[in-house]
């Protein structure tokens, strides 16, 4: 227990109502967030003589201050707890590190609806189907739907400005609602309804309706139409035969857990309308000494409550373990969803098979992760030995990318003991330098990155500078001039230059910008981790540069046209679906864009043609 923190005096002020508490260390950092039905009773348990675990002992020893927020209900406390955990990321809480929103398939509410992938808040008018485990699953499904039910997938800006059908219509992947007379309103609406039923898992209804239409077409001697519908029926059957089908109508998430060597894997199996859509493995950050029960309970709460606005909640959640807050979690989710959500532990019968599958996947993913972790650990240990450091907990690497000195972008990638920390990757747009001056670009990015206060845990042990002696000299100069509150002498600056023929494995390393460098054997684990972080930095820089270059390319030509300012430029690109669509447009099509006169349309047309 901290001598500074007076627990007895504090506990006298605490209420017995439900609420949330935040524990702070001497530096004012939130180190733990918790909730309680009875705040006084719960907080008193931390200051007993016989604490339950070493983790709790370590936590209590660092407490200097505790804040309490009283809530009306326990459900309110549960929601607030997970909001605080997401906000503060306390080191003694189990943390769900993967907070990406799930992708959905979006069927718009337009006159002629379109299909698209969607992530994030659901503001647009239309229907959302999912969630899908990743973007790849959505793109695969969209490609499949395009072959079976040819409704449009183009942006509205393209759709509204077409005078003739595009290539998708020519190859039978779209019915061409953008051009009058190509498809009737009834036929298009029918195909949209098929998509709606198909994505809702009602394949049988789709087949029944298609078969009825095929038979009617045959009776009416419309044999070409009957053959087209027959092909559509066969395509639907081919797809549905490949899908694993559970009990009809099942709409649930199945959660299995594996725990070993201080690392946990939580595997979530997504089942919607009786079909397994996919799955995803999560590896929450687990503080030392944490019990499996706490890992599971915290993960489930964070998974559903923190991301509730981005996630479609299932009707039921299956768990293969007991949950002390099961009723509270079910009530909270039901309140959020506006309908009853059931949380079931250890089900029997057919559903037990899903739990076994989720458990098996969790165990397999954990074995793979531990193997990768072992490799990363070995490589970092080897590099620490080469650099004569006790350990490497954090590395950062910088790279510069540009085309003939234009659109210069610098990247910074971060590795910790677990490998890449992609959430902390950063790009910096470089300005105010002589085009092509990589040294000045490196100087600028390092000053922007390190010329400010940095948390102790964010100070890198090693900073890799891609580019060799010259770039390393810039880094040394920057650090010599830094006036910052953190220990600027802690990071080891290391230059990395490509060797002869610029081949991997021939890299030359420099501690100083003068003198000879040194090389590592091609099979050296230390070299492999250097190559890994350098390649990540290179790819990140190039990706940022390409985005910046594309943005400039889309606007630079229009900027030279008199009468086309920023607002008109934006309107043109929006309605034409980009610069290429504008280049291909006729004068009449350009004139349809709001704010563009016939005369200005002609000027734009001829400027782009020449």
Curated annotation (Swiss-Prot):
InterPro entries: GIY-YIG_endonuc, GIY-YIG_endonuc_sf, GIY-YIG_UvrC_Cho, Hlx-hairpin-Hlx_DNA-bd_motif, RuvA_2-like, UVR_dom, UVR_dom_sf, UvrABC_protein_C
MF GO annotations: DNA binding; excinuclease ABC activity
Any one GO cellular component localisation term in the record: excinuclease repair complex
Family annotation (PROSITE patterns): GIY_YIG, UVR, UVRC
Keyword annotations from UniProtKB, A to Z: Cytoplasm, DNA damage, DNA excision, DNA repair, Excision nuclease, SOS response
Subunit (UniProt): Interacts with UvrB in an incision complex.
Protein name (database record): UvrABC system protein C
NCBIfam families: PRK00558.1-5, uvrC
Record-linked HAMAP family: UvrC (MF_00203)
Location(s), subcellular: Cytoplasm
Main subcellular localisation: cytoplasm
Keyword GTP-binding among UniProt keywords: no
Domain GIY-YIG, residue spans: 16-94
Family per record: Belongs to the UvrC family.
Domain UVR: 204-239
UniProt cross-references to Gene3D superfamilies, sorted A to Z: 5' to 3' exonuclease, C-terminal subdomain, GIY-YIG endonuclease, UVR domain, UvrC, RNAse H endonuclease domain
GO biological process terms, semicolon-separated: nucleotide-excision repair; SOS response
Keyword Repressor: no
Function: The UvrABC repair system catalyzes the recognition and processing of DNA lesions. UvrC both incises the 5' and 3' sides of the lesion. The N-terminal half is responsible for the 3' incision and the C-terminal half is responsible for the 5' incision.
């Amino acid at each position: 227990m901290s001598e500074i923190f007076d627990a007895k005096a504090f506990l006298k002020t605490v209420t017995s109502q439900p609420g949330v508490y935040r524990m702070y260390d001497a530096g004012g950092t939130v180190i733990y967030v918790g909730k309680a039905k009875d705040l006084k009773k719960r907080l008193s348990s931390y200051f007993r003589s016989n604490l339950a675990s070493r983790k709790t002992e370590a936590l209590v020893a660092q407490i200097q201050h505790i804040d309490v927020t009283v809530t009306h209900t326990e459900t309110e406390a549960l929601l607030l707890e997970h909001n605080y955990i997401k906000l503060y990321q306390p080191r003694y809480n189990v943390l769900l590190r993967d907070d990406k929103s799930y992708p959905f398939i979006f069927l718009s509410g337009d006159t002629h609806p379109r299909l698209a992938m969607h992530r994030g808040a659901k503001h647009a008018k239309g229907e959302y189907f999912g969630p899908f485990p990743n973007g790849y699953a959505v793109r695969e499904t969209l490609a499949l739907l395009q072959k079976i039910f040819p409704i449009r997938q183009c942006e509205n800006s393209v759709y509204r400005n077409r005078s003739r059908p595009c290539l998708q219509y020519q190859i039978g992947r779209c019915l061409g609602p953008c051009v009058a007379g190509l498809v009737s309103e009834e036929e298009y609406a029918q195909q949209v309804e098929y998509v709606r039923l198909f994505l809702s898992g009602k394949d049988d209804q789709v087949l029944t309706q298609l078969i009825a239409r095929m038979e009617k077409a045959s009776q009416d001697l419309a044999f070409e139409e009957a053959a087209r519908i027959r092909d559509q029926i066969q395509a639907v059957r081919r797809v549905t035969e490949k899908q694993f089908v559970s009990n009809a109508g099942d709409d649930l998430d199945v959660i299995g857990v594996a725990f070993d060597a201080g690392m946990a894997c939580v595997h979530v199996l997504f089942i919607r309308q009786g079909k397994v859509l996919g799955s995803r493995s999560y590896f929450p950050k687990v503080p030392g000494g944490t019990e499996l029960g706490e890992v599971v309970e915290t993960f489930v709460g964070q998974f559903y409550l923190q991301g509730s606005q981005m996630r479609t909640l299932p009707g039921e959640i299956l768990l293969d373990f007991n949950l002390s807050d099961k009723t509270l979690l079910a009530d909270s989710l039901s309140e959020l969803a506006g309908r009853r959500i059931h949380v079931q532990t250890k089900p029997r019968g057919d559903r037990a098979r899903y739990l076994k599958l989720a458990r098996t996947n969790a165990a397999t993913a954990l074995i793979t992760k531990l193997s990768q972790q072992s490799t990363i650990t070995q490589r970092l240990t080897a590099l620490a030995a080469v650099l004569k450091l006790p350990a490497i907990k954090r590395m950062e690497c910088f790279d510069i990318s540009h085309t003939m000195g234009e659109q210069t972008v610098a990247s910074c990638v971060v590795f910790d003991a677990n490998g890449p920390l992609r959430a902390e990757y950063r790009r910096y747009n470089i300005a105010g330098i002589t085009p092509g001056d990589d040294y000045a670009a490196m100087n600028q990015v390092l000053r922007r990155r390190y010329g400010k206060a940095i948390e102790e845990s964010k100070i890198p042990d090693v900073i890799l500078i891609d580019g060799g002696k010259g770039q390393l000299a810039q880094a040394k100069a920057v650090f010599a001039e830094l006036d910052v509150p953190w220990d600027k002498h802690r990071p080891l600056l290391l230059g990395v230059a490509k060797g002869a023929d610029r081949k991997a494995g021939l890299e030359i390393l420099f501690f100083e910008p003068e003198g000879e460098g040194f090389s590592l054997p091609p099979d050296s684990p230390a070299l492999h981790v250097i190559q890994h972080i350098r390649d990540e930095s290179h790819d990140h820089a190039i990706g940022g540069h390409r985005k910046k270059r594309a943005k400039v390319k889309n606007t630079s030509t229009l900027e030279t046209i008199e009468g086309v300012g920023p607002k008109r430029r934006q309107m043109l690109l929006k309605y034409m679906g980009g610069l290429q669509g504008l280049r291909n447009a006729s004068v009449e099509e350009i004139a349809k864009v709001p704010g563009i006169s016939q005369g200005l349309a002609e000027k734009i047309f001829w400027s782009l043609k020449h």
